[in-house]
Swiss-Prot record:
The keyword Magnesium applies. Coiled coil: none annotated. It comes from Klebsiella pneumoniae subsp. pneumoniae (strain ATCC 700721 / MGH 78578). One of its GO terms (molecular function) is [glutamine synthetase]-adenylyl-L-tyrosine phosphorylase activity. Its cofactor is Mg(2+). It is an enzyme of class 2 (transferase). Its EC number is 2.7.7.89, 2.7.7.42. The gene is glnE. Residues 1-440 are annotated as: Adenylyl removase. CDD domains: NT_GlnE_GlnD_like (cd05401). InterPro entries: GlnE (IPR023057), GlnE_rpt_dom (IPR005190), NT_sf (IPR043519), PII_UdlTrfase/GS_AdlTrfase (IPR013546). It catalyses: [glutamine synthetase]-O(4)-(5'-adenylyl)-L-tyrosine + phosphate = [glutamine synthetase]-L-tyrosine + ADP; [glutamine synthetase]-L-tyrosine + ATP = [glutamine synthetase]-O(4)-(5'-adenylyl)-L-tyrosine + diphosphate. This is Bifunctional glutamine synthetase adenylyltransferase/adenylyl-removing enzyme. Keywords: ATP-binding, Magnesium, Multifunctional enzyme, Nucleotide-binding, Nucleotidyltransferase, Transferase.
Length: 945
């Protein structure tokens, strides 16, 4: 034993002074004094359990004593009757054995390889004993889990990382994966559970028994994140589920982790052999796999970035030339050649390194240098952790702990130890760089690209600093990191194949660099991640965005500008194709071309396939709306033109729907016989409201009224003949059905037919004569107001002319001014009372006083009031052109007409853009004050005077 340095002798005196009065200080051997001066953990443990000192004196720790761990622990567990007792005994046994291991290590009673073995066997012994005790307890409670043949099913535990390799460090987490062989249910218990439930509950209890801190401490911190799907996945998986996961979507890092996986406990049973055989093809490829080098280089780069980012200076595990680089060197050969060289299929590092040397895979002497460095670094790591039973690999800055490590490593002082350490780490770094290559980026561009890869691939936390985000304020930086972290968690729940992950890893750094160059980075990122979540399992779409940078830029621009567009793209990723050509993306279809475009689009789909026809109609609408929204966002379409395009689009779709419905009806019932000697179909669709007024918005419904001119006695001429008027009723019902059927792309439009004669109580389709009679004799004033904004949007020229004549006759009917004024005003007040002000501290752009509805009521009132003298007022159905007509016919002065037109288009523009933002149509109470004053003044002038 090396004598204590003066500094440690002085520290021992401090330790002795604080020992309890009844502590047998005088009886302590020089060895005991040295170890207690070295390790606070040992000091505190023997103060709490003085009897352990006697055991150490009577039975000094030995290299082979790990062989007795199982028997010693089982002896202590015999008297345990409940989980609390189990947890206490596990903790005390672990602490006592760790004191013995620390004692032997500090005094160099055992070699470093033997210390690693003791630490690993101790952990395995505790894990298996806890599992077996809890398995028996759970079987008593719920019965024994069995497969379909009644064979009992065990819980198998894969120890990962250093635990699996038999190289556990002194104070370490344990990485575990739980599995059970076959599905089935429990038998013989008070109530039956399926095996998944049983093993999940058992797994939860096992983690609690090992991990939960009590007054006796904890056994091990348990990390289950290496299991399939990580924290998002089931706690325990069946063999079949494990096999499916690793075959379909096992990632490179999971393959590397599985190299060291070892089944805890019985390694020779049939189920253990089955599990090993199942995992082997995933880990060791039959061919030489050089792609491993780049993957490991990427992983090493990620670790190096973490070291830099977190300021992990003097880290003997993760730093340059540290333990992790030795592990990487060994894994490169295991993963490249392990499938062909059984000698490389070992879990422990040192035997594998010896096999690498025997196979001459490293230059002469390098394996010897790596072995020496590994043992040096592992001893230093374990000594460092045994000081306080603390999981750390960072060298101390204080003089006391530096003196402790110098003594434990048999060097005279810290400077000597530092020089030895630097020499070992330099040797490791040289071998690593020669084999895997230095990952340091050379040029500024390469460095920047590295930062974006870091941002995506490293599990950055909100407090981490990334150079890529240095230009963002703290709140935005945290938001971006949180969004990326949430997206990564969501990905863990998805089934993504290796190709999909590869493309995603190529795409994301580019996407993040584009988004994070914007001042509003969190906004587009929050809108795009739901889209990406929806397409990660569809590699074609990921490749589209990865291979077409222009499409990616347009996606970010549109999503940043509009959550409506982002939501639409997320729901219907087929629309991503529309981003490929910027020349067409921001250019909506020409005004007269929507029908032709749709006709061409539908030619791709078999005419007889109704389902595909419906889907194609919806896809066409969504694609065209995306083009309109893109032009709207880009500012190339003013508000009037946006509504025009949305209206033309709706008319083209209505035309196609009527054609489809007509074809289906004629195929089923034949043609109404009154059509034999004439052109056309004797059918018309009247658009009311926003459709009639050329004022559709992005989410507007369609107000429709259906007319026909079929005489009462007409029948159809098909094999299943029906009454002609019944034919038109079923035609209208079919049209409504085609609009409202929900496919994977949603519905076409919401359709409202309640503006027909007698409303919801009336016939869905009426004759033109019945419509005229109703309007003349039964309709209310508000129905005549609605007629102002009505026009035929589909129909025979003759029927259209008939409707136009009816509309003109009704609108030009002389009316008594005061009565009309009262009726219009009362209707407006009823609307206000019915709708109510749902946002008392906001201005509802459409419904509140001074808003859009007031303007509409003003124009409708003026048409009804003056059209008898000025029939030209009935020419148009949209408010803007009606206001022009009012000025041209000297009813309203031009200044007022212009002011109302400005107010109307301004308010409608605001509604359009709120819709693009998926925001409700109300704004701050002081907004649009000038426009509202104008509308209120006109209301006062025309309807209150």
């Amino acid at each position: 034993m090396m004598p204590l340095s003066p500094q440690l002798q002085q520290h021992w005196q401090t330790v002795a002074d604080r020992l309890p009065a009844d502590f047998p200080v005088a009886e302590l051997s020089p060895q005991a004094r040295s170890v207690m001066a070295f390790s606070d953990f040992v000091e505190q443990s023997v103060i709490a359990q003085p009897g352990w000192l006697n055991e150490l004196a009577d039975s000094a720790p030995a290299a082979e004593e790990w062989r007795h761990y199982e028997a010693w622990l089982q002896e202590r567990l015999q008297a345990v009757t409940d989980e609390a007792g189990l947890m206490r005994e596990l903790r005390l046994f672990r602490r006592q054995m760790m004191v013995r291991i620390a004692w032997a290590q500090a005094l160099s009673l055992v070699r470093e390889e033997e210390t690693l073995q003791q630490l690993s066997v101790l952990a395995e012994t505790l894990i298996v004993a806890a599992r077996d005790w809890l398995y028996a307890a759970c079987c008593k409670e719920w019965g024994t889990p069995c497969n379909a043949e009644g064979q009992p099913q065990p819980l198998l535990i894969l120890g990962m990382g250093k635990l699996g390799g038999g190289e556990l460090n002194f104070s370490s987490d344990i990485d575990l994966i739980f599995a059970w062989p076959e599905h089935g249910a429990t038998r013989g218990g008070r109530r039956e559970l399926d095996n998944a439930q049983f093993f999940t509950r058992l797994g939860q209890r096992l983690i609690k028994a090992l991990d939960q801190p009590t007054q006796d401490g904890f056994v091990y911190r348990v990390d289950m994140r290496l299991r399939p799907f990580g924290d998002s996945g089931p706690l325990v998986l069946s063999f079949a589920a494990l096999e499916d996961y690793y075959q379909e979507q096992g990632r490179d890092w999971e393959r590397y982790a599985m190299v060291k996986a070892r089944i805890m406990g019985d390694n020779d049973g049939a189920y253990a052999s089955e599990l090993r055989a199942m995992l082997r093809p995933f880990v060791f490829r039959r061919y030489i796999d050089f792609s491993v080098i780049q993957s490991l280089r990427n992983m090493k780069g990620m670790i190096a970035r973490e070291v830099r980012r977190r300021g992990l200076k003097d880290n003997i595990k993760l730093g340059a030339g540290g333990i992790r680089e030795i592990e990487f060197i060994v894994q490169v050969f295991q993963l490249i050649r392990g499938g062909r060289e059984p000698a490389l299929q070992q879990r422990a590092l040192l035997p594998t390194l010896a096999a690498i040397d025997e196979l001459h895979l490293l230059p002469e002497g390098d394996a010897t240098l790596l072995r020496a460095a590994y043992l040096f670094l592992r001893r230093l790591e374990n000594l460092l952790q045994s000081i306080n039973d603390e999981q750390t690999q960072t060298l101390p800055q204080d003089e006391l702990n530096r003196a402790r490590l110098a003594w434990g490593m048999h060097t005279d002082d810290w400077e000597t130890l530092s020089a030895q350490l630097a020499n070992h780490m330099a040797n490791v770094r040289r071998v690593f760089n020669e084999l895997i290559g230095d990952d340091e980026a050379q040029s500024p561009d390469e460095q920047l690209a590295e930062y974006w890869r870091e941002l995506w691939q490293d599990a950055l936390e909100e407090d981490d600093a990334s150079p890529a985000l240095a230009h963002l304020n703290d709140a935005d930086r945290r938001s971006v990191l949180a969004l990326i972290a949430d997206f990564r968690k969501e990905l863990d729940r998805r089934t993504i194949g290796p190709r999909g992950r590869q493309v995603l890893d190529q795409l994301m750094p580019h996407l993040l660099s584009e988004i994070c160059s914007r001042a509003d980075a969190p906004l587009p990122l929050a809108r795009i991640t739901p889209l990406l979540t929806g397409i990660v399992t569809r590699t074609t779409y990921l490749e589209l965005l990865s291979e077409f940078p222009g499409a990616l830029k347009h996606l970010i621009t549109l999503c940043a500008a509009s959550p409506m567009v982002a939501s639409q793209l997320a729901r219907h990723p087929l629309l991503l194709d529309e981003l490929l050509d910027p020349n067409t993306l921001y250019q909506p279809t020409a005004t007269d071309a929507y029908r032709d475009e749709l006709r061409q689009y539908l030619l791709r789909v078999p005419e007889e396939d109704e389902e595909q026809q419906l889907e194609a109609l919806r896809q066409f609408k969504q694609a065209q709306q995306l083009h309109i929204a893109a032009a709207d966002i880009a500012g190339t379409l003013p508000v009037m033109k946006v509504s025009d395009h949305l209206t033309w689009l709706a008319e083209a779709i209505l035309d196609a729907v009527v054609q489809q419905a007509w074809g289906q009806m004629v195929a089923r019932y034949g043609l109404p016989t009154h059509l034999h000697d004439r052109q056309g179909r004797g059918f018309a669709v009247v658009g009311y409201g926003k459709l009639g007024g050329w004022e559709l918005g992005y989410s507007s419904d369609l107000d429709l009224v259906f007319l026909h001119d079929c005489p009462a006695e007409v029948m159809t001429d098909g094999e299943r003949e029906i009454d002609g008027r019944q034919f038109y009723l079923r035609l209208a019902q079919r049209i409504m059905h085609l609009f409202s059927t929900r496919t994977s792309s949603g519905i076409l439009y919401e359709v409202d037919a309640r503006l027909r004669p007698s409303g919801a109580a009336g016939m869905l389709v009426t004759t033109a004569d019945a419509f005229a009679d109703y309007q003349q004799n039964e309709a209310w004033t508000w129905e005549h107001q609605a007629l102002v904004r009505a026009r035929v949007v589909y129909g025979d020229p003759a029927l259209q002319a008939r409707f136009d004549a009816i509309r003109r006759d009704i609108l030009t009917t002389p009316r008594e001014g005061a009565t009309l004024q009262t009726e219009v005003r009362e209707m407006r007040e009823k609307m206000r009372a019915h709708l109510g002000n749902k946002h008392p501290n906001r201005f509802d752009i459409k419904a509140d006083a001074g808003g859009i509805t007031d303007i509409e009521f003003i124009t409708q009132y003026l048409v009804l009031r003056y059209a008898s003298d000025k029939p030209k007022l009935t020419r148009w159905s949209d408010n803007v052109r009606i206001l022009e007509l009012l000025a041209q016919n000297d009813i309203m002065d031009e200044e007022e007409a212009r002011a109302l037109t400005h107010a109307y288009t301004t308010l409608r523009d605001a509604l359009h853009h709120l819709a693009l933002q998926e925001l409700p149509g109300h704004v701050a109470p002081e907004a649009f004050s000038r426009e509202r004053e104008q509308v209120s003044a006109s209301w006062q002038k025309w309807l209150m005077a």
